Amino acid sequence: MEKLAAGLAGLRWSMGAFPLDLIVSRCRLPTLACLGPGEYAEGVSERDILLIHSCRQWTTVTAHTLEEGHYVIGPKIDIPLQYPGKFKLLEQARDVREPVRYFSSVEEVASVFPDRIFVMEAITFSVKVVSGEFSEDSEVYNFTLHAGDELTLMGQAEILCAKTTKERSRFTTLLRKLGRAGALAGIGGPGSMGATGGGGGAARPVKSKMPCLICMNHRTNESLSLPFQCQGRFSTRSPLELQMQEGEHTVRAIIERVRLPVNVLVPSRPPRNPYDLHPVREGHCYKLVSIISKTVVLGLALRREGPAPLHFLLLTDTPRFTLPQGLLAGDPRVERLVRDSASYCRERFDPDEYSTAVREAPAELSDDCASPRHARLCLPAPRAPGAVRAPGPPGRLGPALPAPGDSDQDYVSPDWAGVSEPAGGCAEIPYEELWVHQAPESRADARARPLAGPDLISFGIVGPPRHEPEAPPPPVPPKSEAVKEECRLLHAPPVPPRGGGSCSKLTGSPPVLPHFPKLQPVHSPSSSLSYYSSGLQDGAGSRSGSGSPSPDAYSLYCYPCTWGDCKASESSSRPPPGPLPSTTTQPSQASRGLSEPLSGRTPSLLGADTPVVKNYHSCPPLFKSSRPQKSFAPFGALNPFSGPAHPSGAPAASSSGSISTSGVLATSSPTHSPGPGPGPQGQGYSAAPSSSLSSSEWQEPALEPLDPFELGQASPPELELVRCQEPRAAGAPGSGPCLSPLGQPKAFEPEGLVLRQVPASLSPAALQGPEAGGTLLFLTQGCLEGPPGSPREGATGAGVRDASSWQPPADLSALSLEEVSRSLRFIGLSEDVVSFFARERIDGSIFVQLSEDILADDFHLTKLQVKKIMQFIKGWRPKI
């Protein structure tokens, strides 16, 4: 052992780690391996050298221990099918509920109609079946049942059978020959002549309906019809099971002959196995529940006190291991060490005994984590400039940024924060801390040093490691430059120029990082959001593997905005110039936000001649998305109804060249009205290029007093959100080229378009729900039109329609929560249905994807309500 230990200590290990399934498939077993860096396997330390022994198929029977009169269920154990001990069948609970019954015909079985029956003796039956009531075609139907066949009863039916009778009248025979006996005999037409033949005493078929029992034969996996006239012996218990009521039997014999679950007793002292982890003692009772097969890899940890056997489930426990250098190249020194280790373990380890040991079954993930919202999962902090994209339910995605205090801190998804992970030691971090107070210093630390803790679950790193050259992360610039860097990292556009000039002459495009930061799933922070509004009902989603930002990465933050969930971002340096408070669903925050007037802005930053126009941060609709996103906005800047009035301007590019809008933006302020300002030449309208699959939102960080703008990308070219901008002072900090991050910009002339405004007399009561806040905005269906003949005409045209004359649009996928409620009232649904949809946060993008099964089974709507909604989605409108 000393010589072997010295040889093992001198081994040099490979730089990369390989998954266990790859090692088993590529390497000749047995082989040596060592746990990879950052990997975890139960019972294995980083210093252990493993001998991967062999790969085996284990078939085990899952059983529960029975205690106190067979009512208390104890721990769950796995009994191998090769277990040598014997068991005795107990009186089953089903024997008391459903006593064994015997039947002598199919008709008797049909009168009782048990769930299943067993054939006690071989049965053969033949019947002549007619294909139709008005057809002479018939065929003989034969079937044979074997003793022991298990039949599951499915229902009853009737078949048309043909019986032959003797003709007693020659006149009838003559008429039949002439084809005139149809009215007398009930069967007419010349087609019957060939069937009967001529002459007296000929046989003619008579059709009759025969009841039968429809069953499924599990031996042949076919459905068959047993006529009631079929005679034979049947029972509710298998003949093999009845024979096994007496005597002692192995687990394999019980599994092959008895239907599970079944209660068994240990009648005598079982043989001992040194590898047993659960002692099976005489007198113990067990309930055999199910049978399962799994592929395991046997291994031994080579230690000075002796080899310690262990095993890994090949498809679930797949940690990564490093291999000795020279193993794959056939180094004779390494091969000799492998042979010596195998011979050393052969004397001290019996793989057959180890495979037949009784063990306590591991807890299944489905038992502890019935839903992904309660999964006990620890996600590591990012090791690269961006986060790791993790496959999983397409809930909310967001960049996983380190906390200010500790860059090595592991993260717990928000909905999982209530469940502690003892192995990972993850701290419970409130959801808001993931998005606010993001100091650049902590991010720089996270980029500089990798994560020290173990990677409990490896997302997206299956297979050999990729040795691609990665560009080093850029250094953290000063504050103003850090804002631009964070904008780029968070899929945000660069800061627009402060001057009022047109952006159409700028044709550049902002640089894209070589490796764009990927995103990590973050579930809903709000427990009030339901399953349907979270987007978890659809698991399909496209992934982009390129270095450029994925199209569906743009739609991860804003649409459809549940503005009640938005949180205002707090600046870590100096506050923005008079931002409006965020509008949330919490009464305390809402009342605090309404108490701050617009006049509280800094006079030096907001002059009297500057129009106080509330900038609308667009949340573009998501049309025909492959997966509905959950509504949320992590930064306050994404809340259309919170934050200061930002100027925004960007070139507009549309695939069709035409610009339209999904609504008319109407702005009214309770304290201020727009003052005189520059003419239309200083204003512009911006609309992002369209995408047929997803929408894009840009986040603005809260580190710059003069906030960068947000650019929203609408989905189809015929429905885009267009916003109004106000000029910025020339020479303001952050002025730079106005570049479109999504492609080549096109020139856009705004002189021919105008946004209709709401009259100042709009009541705040017109805005209900989370839309009500410090600044009143109202968005209605409409379109951008040319300038009216007079300013009065533009102000009073049709900005806000009366509620009674509201009509739902043809495309329902852009509806807001309030408009979905109005649509349901429009088609005449009751208020309880409307309130249910509002409570479930069903907006247009989710509304158009609802199916009849969801409406009927999950929403518990009546058939009429389901039909109304489905027809309404397909384009039906009631004629009023």
UniProtKB/Swiss-Prot annotation:
Sorted UniProt keywords: Phosphoprotein
Segments of this protein annotated with the region Disordered: 385-407, 461-483, 527-548, 569-611, 633-713
Biological process according to GO: cognition; neuron projection extension; response to stress; social behavior
Keyword presence, Ligase: no
Bias type Low complexity, positions: 640-663, 683-696
Chain residue ranges for the region called CABIT: 12-320
Domain SAM per the UniProt entry, residue ranges: 813-877
PTM-bearing positions, type Phosphoserine: S740
UniProt cross-references to Pfam families, sorted A to Z: CABIT
Gene3D superfamilies: Transcription Factor, Ets-1
Role of this protein: Probable adapter protein that provides a critical link between cell surface epidermal growth factor receptor and the MAPK/ERK signaling pathway.
UniProt record similarity statement: Belongs to the GAREM family.
Protein name: GRB2-associated and regulator of MAPK protein 2
Organism of derivation: Mus musculus
